[in-house]
Amino acid sequence: MEQPRKAVVVTGFGPFGEHAVNASWIAVQELEKLGLGDSVDLHVYEIPVEYQTVQRLIPALWEKHSPQLVVHVGVSGMATTVTLEKCGHNKGYKGLDNCRFCPGSQCCVEDGPESIDSIIDMDAVCKRVTTLGLDVSVTISQDAGRYLCDFTYYTSLYRGRGRSAFVHVPPLGKPYNADQLGRALRAIIEEMLGVLEQAEGDISCCHQL
């Protein structure tokens, strides 16, 4: 019997500040060209760097697609590797967005937990991707930066009960080009899906014991 296709949503960000071309959206567009194989329905979206749009759009994407996984991709001017973020944070949002706005409460979800961890084992994903021998270095982080990246991640983790991931990429050419970032994203997301399936298989086995 044919397995149902999995829905995977991947987002990148639009321009902001010094990033007139946002490497995250370029990388996501490269991923879209490559695809994630016949068993995955890939849906990609460009997200404006605006808190209020994120608060409206992220829950809508979860509602529309009921995805197996949502992966958000953002650019970090400080990054020199492709970085897997373990968690999103609820408070500390003071930086103004493209609309010169920041939440009055400085938080994502009032009365929400301080932080939410992804249910994906990022250490395992990092190790698996590293063994593939890609020409891109992959590392782990627990601080997505308290700006729109972190805000988006927490919002998605909260709505998706942890079935979300965030990947930070460096600016284009520092040191990776668009093709390298797109291929790295594909490898990372394929490994994330593998780790998720393995974890769910383990849970299913435990329930049957």
UniProtKB/Swiss-Prot annotation:
> What is this protein called in UniProt?
Pyroglutamyl-peptidase 1
Q: Name one GO molecular function term.
A: peptidase activity
- GO cellular component terms given for this protein: cytosol
Catalytic machinery residues: E85, C149, H168
Q: Which SUPFAM superfamilies match?
A: Pyrrolidone carboxyl peptidase (pyroglutamate aminopeptidase)
Source organism phylogeny: Eukaryota, Metazoa, Chordata, Craniata, Vertebrata
InterPro entries the record matches: Peptidase_C15, Peptidase_C15-like, Peptidase_C15-like_sf, PGPEP1_Cys_AS, PGPEP1_Glu_AS
Example GO BP: proteolysis
> Which family, according to UniProt?
Belongs to the peptidase C15 family.
Q: What is its EC number?
A: 3.4.19.3
Name the principal localization, coarsely classed: cytoplasm
List localization entries.
Cytoplasm
**How does this polypeptide assemble, per the annotation?**
Monomer.
Which transformation does this protein catalyse, written as a reaction? Release of an N-terminal pyroglutamyl group from a polypeptide, the second amino acid generally not being Pro
Q: Which Pfam families match?
A: Peptidase_C15
Q: In which organism is this protein found?
A: Rattus norvegicus
Q: Which keywords has UniProt assigned to this entry?
A: Cytoplasm, Hydrolase, Protease, Thiol protease
